[in-house]
Amino acid sequence: RDRAGVGRRHGAAVAEGLANEGMRVVCSDIDGQTAEATAARIGGDAIAVATDVADPAAVEALANQSFDHFGQVDVLFNNAGVFQGGLAWERSLEDWHWTFGVNVFGIIHGIKYFVPRMIAQETDGHVVNTASVAAFVAGATSGPYVVSKCAAFSLSESLALDLGAVGSKIGASVLTPSTFDTGIAKTARVRPSHLGEDKTPDGLVVAEYLQKQLDSGMPASEAFTPFINGIRTGEFLIPTKPSYADQIRNRYEALLKRQIPGQLVPD
Protein backbone atom coordinates (compact mmCIF):
# COMPACT_ATOMS: atom_id res chain seq x y z
CA ARG A 1 0.00 0.00 0.00
CA ASP A 2 1.48 3.34 -0.88
CA ARG A 3 0.78 7.03 -0.52
CA ALA A 4 2.48 10.22 -1.66
CA GLY A 5 2.47 13.50 0.23
CA VAL A 6 1.51 12.27 3.68
CA GLY A 7 3.69 14.33 5.96
CA ARG A 8 1.15 16.83 7.25
CA ARG A 9 -2.48 17.45 8.06
CA HIS A 10 -5.00 15.47 6.04
CA GLY A 11 -2.30 13.43 4.30
CA ALA A 12 -1.05 12.18 7.64
CA ALA A 13 -4.63 11.58 8.79
CA VAL A 14 -5.31 9.38 5.78
CA ALA A 15 -2.03 7.50 6.24
CA GLU A 16 -2.88 6.76 9.85
CA GLY A 17 -6.42 5.77 8.90
CA LEU A 18 -5.20 3.32 6.27
CA ALA A 19 -2.80 1.80 8.79
CA ASN A 20 -5.70 1.35 11.20
CA GLU A 21 -7.48 -0.53 8.40
CA GLY A 22 -4.61 -3.01 8.40
CA MET A 23 -2.68 -1.62 5.46
CA ARG A 24 1.08 -1.29 5.36
CA VAL A 25 1.93 2.30 4.53
CA VAL A 26 4.71 4.13 2.73
CA CYS A 27 4.81 7.73 3.94
CA SER A 28 6.24 10.12 1.37
CA ASP A 29 6.85 13.84 1.68
CA ILE A 30 9.34 16.37 0.35
CA ASP A 31 10.39 16.81 3.98
CA GLY A 32 11.91 13.49 4.97
CA GLN A 33 11.79 14.25 8.70
CA THR A 34 8.08 14.94 8.53
CA ALA A 35 7.45 11.71 6.63
CA GLU A 36 9.51 9.83 9.21
CA ALA A 37 7.50 11.38 12.05
CA THR A 38 4.27 10.19 10.44
CA ALA A 39 5.68 6.70 9.93
CA ALA A 40 6.86 6.64 13.54
CA ARG A 41 3.37 7.53 14.81
CA ILE A 42 1.92 4.73 12.70
CA GLY A 43 4.56 2.23 13.77
CA GLY A 44 4.54 -1.36 12.60
CA ASP A 45 5.65 -1.83 9.00
CA ALA A 46 5.30 1.83 7.99
CA ILE A 47 8.29 3.31 6.19
CA ALA A 48 9.15 6.86 5.13
CA VAL A 49 10.66 8.03 1.85
CA ALA A 50 11.63 11.65 1.18
CA THR A 51 10.30 12.48 -2.28
CA ASP A 52 9.97 15.59 -4.41
CA VAL A 53 7.04 14.57 -6.60
CA ALA A 54 7.95 17.24 -9.16
CA ASP A 55 11.08 15.18 -9.91
CA PRO A 56 10.22 12.14 -12.06
CA ALA A 57 13.38 10.29 -11.02
CA ALA A 58 12.44 10.72 -7.36
CA VAL A 59 8.94 9.31 -7.93
CA GLU A 60 10.36 6.40 -9.91
CA ALA A 61 12.69 5.69 -6.98
CA LEU A 62 9.71 5.90 -4.61
CA ALA A 63 7.83 3.36 -6.70
CA ASN A 64 10.81 1.02 -6.82
CA GLN A 65 11.30 1.20 -3.07
CA SER A 66 7.59 0.68 -2.39
CA PHE A 67 7.28 -2.38 -4.60
CA ASP A 68 10.61 -3.80 -3.49
CA HIS A 69 9.74 -3.41 0.19
CA PHE A 70 6.14 -4.59 0.20
CA GLY A 71 5.83 -6.57 -3.03
CA GLN A 72 2.76 -4.75 -4.30
CA VAL A 73 0.85 -1.47 -4.06
CA ASP A 74 -2.92 -1.50 -3.65
CA VAL A 75 -3.78 2.13 -2.87
CA LEU A 76 -1.92 5.12 -4.31
CA PHE A 77 -2.73 8.57 -2.90
CA ASN A 78 -1.26 11.37 -5.03
CA ASN A 79 -1.77 14.08 -2.46
CA ALA A 80 1.19 16.48 -2.57
CA GLY A 81 0.19 20.05 -3.37
CA VAL A 82 1.30 23.66 -3.13
CA PHE A 83 -0.53 26.97 -3.23
CA GLN A 84 0.40 29.97 -5.34
CA GLY A 85 -1.96 32.90 -5.29
CA GLY A 86 -1.92 36.30 -6.89
CA LEU A 87 -3.10 37.99 -10.06
CA ALA A 88 -2.51 35.82 -13.11
CA TRP A 89 -0.48 38.45 -14.96
CA GLU A 90 1.66 39.23 -11.92
CA ARG A 91 2.89 35.66 -11.44
CA SER A 92 6.27 34.76 -12.85
CA LEU A 93 6.62 31.84 -15.23
CA GLU A 94 8.67 30.15 -12.52
CA ASP A 95 5.68 30.42 -10.14
CA TRP A 96 3.46 28.72 -12.70
CA HIS A 97 6.01 25.99 -13.38
CA TRP A 98 6.48 25.30 -9.67
CA THR A 99 2.75 25.04 -9.03
CA PHE A 100 2.15 22.77 -12.00
CA GLY A 101 5.28 20.75 -11.24
CA VAL A 102 3.82 19.63 -7.92
CA ASN A 103 0.05 19.81 -8.38
CA VAL A 104 -0.15 18.33 -11.88
CA PHE A 105 3.11 16.67 -12.81
CA GLY A 106 3.37 15.18 -9.33
CA ILE A 107 0.22 13.23 -10.16
CA ILE A 108 1.43 12.44 -13.68
CA HIS A 109 4.65 11.03 -12.26
CA GLY A 110 2.69 8.91 -9.78
CA ILE A 111 0.52 7.55 -12.57
CA LYS A 112 3.52 6.89 -14.80
CA TYR A 113 5.58 4.93 -12.29
CA PHE A 114 2.94 3.22 -10.14
CA VAL A 115 -0.14 2.48 -12.24
CA PRO A 116 1.39 0.11 -14.84
CA ARG A 117 2.77 -2.05 -12.05
CA MET A 118 -0.51 -1.92 -10.15
CA ILE A 119 -2.36 -3.05 -13.28
CA ALA A 120 0.12 -5.89 -13.79
CA GLN A 121 -0.69 -7.23 -10.31
CA GLU A 122 -4.19 -8.12 -11.61
CA THR A 123 -5.61 -7.39 -8.16
CA ASP A 124 -8.14 -4.84 -6.98
CA GLY A 125 -6.64 -1.45 -6.25
CA HIS A 126 -7.33 2.26 -6.26
CA VAL A 127 -5.70 5.57 -7.12
CA VAL A 128 -6.88 8.75 -5.41
CA ASN A 129 -5.64 12.11 -6.69
CA THR A 130 -6.10 15.30 -4.70
CA ALA A 131 -7.62 18.25 -6.55
CA SER A 132 -9.75 20.86 -4.77
CA VAL A 133 -13.23 22.30 -4.68
CA ALA A 134 -11.49 25.13 -6.57
CA ALA A 135 -11.57 22.83 -9.60
CA PHE A 136 -15.30 23.62 -9.77
CA VAL A 137 -15.66 27.00 -8.10
CA ALA A 138 -12.82 29.40 -8.77
CA GLY A 139 -11.89 32.66 -7.11
CA ALA A 140 -9.95 35.73 -8.09
CA THR A 141 -6.23 36.10 -7.30
CA SER A 142 -5.59 32.35 -7.21
CA GLY A 143 -4.84 31.63 -10.87
CA PRO A 144 -1.89 29.20 -10.67
CA TYR A 145 -3.52 27.13 -7.94
CA VAL A 146 -7.00 27.04 -9.45
CA VAL A 147 -5.77 26.20 -12.94
CA SER A 148 -3.54 23.42 -11.60
CA LYS A 149 -6.41 21.90 -9.64
CA CYS A 150 -8.67 21.99 -12.70
CA ALA A 151 -5.93 20.10 -14.52
CA ALA A 152 -5.64 17.60 -11.66
CA PHE A 153 -9.38 16.97 -11.84
CA SER A 154 -9.34 16.45 -15.62
CA LEU A 155 -6.31 14.20 -15.30
CA SER A 156 -8.21 12.08 -12.79
CA GLU A 157 -11.16 11.82 -15.18
CA SER A 158 -8.85 10.68 -17.97
CA LEU A 159 -7.20 8.13 -15.70
CA ALA A 160 -10.54 6.68 -14.59
CA LEU A 161 -11.78 6.42 -18.18
CA ASP A 162 -8.51 4.88 -19.38
CA LEU A 163 -8.55 2.27 -16.63
CA GLY A 164 -12.13 1.41 -17.49
CA ALA A 165 -11.34 1.19 -21.20
CA VAL A 166 -8.72 -1.52 -20.63
CA GLY A 167 -10.84 -3.42 -18.12
CA SER A 168 -8.44 -2.85 -15.26
CA LYS A 169 -9.26 -3.82 -11.69
CA ILE A 170 -7.77 -0.50 -10.60
CA GLY A 171 -10.23 2.28 -9.83
CA ALA A 172 -9.56 6.01 -9.75
CA SER A 173 -11.08 8.83 -7.74
CA VAL A 174 -10.43 12.50 -7.13
CA LEU A 175 -10.50 14.03 -3.66
CA THR A 176 -11.78 17.62 -3.64
CA PRO A 177 -11.04 19.20 -0.24
CA SER A 178 -12.95 22.32 0.71
CA THR A 179 -12.32 24.49 3.75
CA PHE A 180 -10.53 22.22 6.13
CA ASP A 181 -7.03 22.36 7.50
CA THR A 182 -4.89 20.93 4.72
CA GLY A 183 -1.92 23.20 5.35
CA ILE A 184 -2.03 24.25 1.69
CA ALA A 185 -1.78 27.97 2.54
CA LYS A 186 1.59 27.44 4.23
CA THR A 187 3.48 25.84 1.35
CA ALA A 188 5.93 28.73 1.21
CA ARG A 189 8.09 26.46 3.39
CA VAL A 190 8.72 24.22 0.37
CA ARG A 191 8.97 27.02 -2.18
CA PRO A 192 12.23 26.52 -4.13
CA SER A 193 14.94 28.90 -2.98
CA HIS A 194 15.66 30.11 -6.51
CA LEU A 195 12.13 31.57 -6.68
CA GLY A 196 12.74 33.73 -3.65
CA GLU A 197 10.13 34.59 -1.04
CA ASP A 198 6.77 35.69 -2.43
CA LYS A 199 6.26 39.12 -0.89
CA THR A 200 4.00 40.53 -3.59
CA PRO A 201 0.87 42.21 -2.17
CA ASP A 202 -1.51 40.18 -4.35
CA GLY A 203 0.03 36.88 -3.28
CA LEU A 204 0.21 37.75 0.42
CA VAL A 205 -3.39 38.93 0.63
CA VAL A 206 -4.90 35.79 -0.87
CA ALA A 207 -2.66 33.48 1.18
CA GLU A 208 -3.74 35.25 4.38
CA TYR A 209 -7.41 35.05 3.38
CA LEU A 210 -7.09 31.36 2.53
CA GLN A 211 -5.46 30.55 5.85
CA LYS A 212 -8.30 32.25 7.75
CA GLN A 213 -10.82 30.11 5.89
CA LEU A 214 -8.87 26.93 6.57
CA ASP A 215 -8.45 27.78 10.26
CA SER A 216 -12.23 27.94 10.64
CA GLY A 217 -12.84 24.79 8.60
CA MET A 218 -13.15 21.15 9.59
CA PRO A 219 -10.10 19.52 11.23
CA ALA A 220 -7.72 17.49 9.10
CA SER A 221 -8.43 14.43 11.23
CA GLU A 222 -11.85 14.16 9.57
CA ALA A 223 -10.36 13.63 6.11
CA PHE A 224 -10.10 9.86 6.34
CA THR A 225 -13.81 9.03 6.53
CA PRO A 226 -14.80 10.48 3.12
CA PHE A 227 -11.55 9.12 1.66
CA ILE A 228 -12.11 5.48 2.63
CA ASN A 229 -15.87 5.61 2.03
CA GLY A 230 -15.25 6.94 -1.48
CA ILE A 231 -12.93 4.04 -2.27
CA ARG A 232 -15.31 1.45 -0.81
CA THR A 233 -18.31 2.73 -2.73
CA GLY A 234 -16.41 3.34 -5.96
CA GLU A 235 -17.17 7.06 -6.07
CA PHE A 236 -15.21 9.04 -8.62
CA LEU A 237 -15.73 12.38 -6.89
CA ILE A 238 -14.85 12.37 -3.19
CA PRO A 239 -15.85 15.68 -1.57
CA THR A 240 -14.97 16.43 2.03
CA LYS A 241 -18.26 18.30 2.47
CA PRO A 242 -21.61 17.92 0.74
CA SER A 243 -22.38 21.62 1.16
CA TYR A 244 -20.67 22.70 -2.06
CA ALA A 245 -23.16 20.84 -4.24
CA ASP A 246 -25.22 23.98 -4.79
CA GLN A 247 -22.18 26.00 -5.81
CA ILE A 248 -21.08 23.29 -8.22
CA ARG A 249 -24.57 23.23 -9.71
CA ASN A 250 -24.56 27.02 -9.98
CA ARG A 251 -21.26 26.88 -11.85
CA TYR A 252 -22.62 24.72 -14.63
CA GLU A 253 -25.89 26.61 -14.80
CA ALA A 254 -23.88 29.81 -15.31
CA LEU A 255 -21.81 28.16 -18.03
CA LEU A 256 -24.94 26.99 -19.81
CA LYS A 257 -26.00 30.64 -19.83
CA ARG A 258 -22.54 31.54 -21.21
CA GLN A 259 -21.74 33.53 -18.08
CA ILE A 260 -18.70 33.58 -15.80
CA PRO A 261 -19.38 31.33 -12.80
CA GLY A 262 -19.55 32.92 -9.37
CA GLN A 263 -16.70 32.76 -6.89
CA LEU A 264 -16.30 30.25 -4.10
CA VAL A 265 -18.26 31.30 -1.02
CA PRO A 266 -17.03 29.49 2.11
CA ASP A 267 -19.70 28.20 4.44
Question: Where does each model-flagged region fall?
Answer:
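Canonical Rossmann dinucleotide-binding motif of NAD(H)/NADP(H)-dependent dehydrogenases/reductases
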Residues: 1-26
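Active-site helix of classical SDR
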Residues: 111, 148
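Residue(s) in the substrate-gating loop at a strand-loop-helix junction
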Residues: 132
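SDR active-site lid
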Residues: 165-237
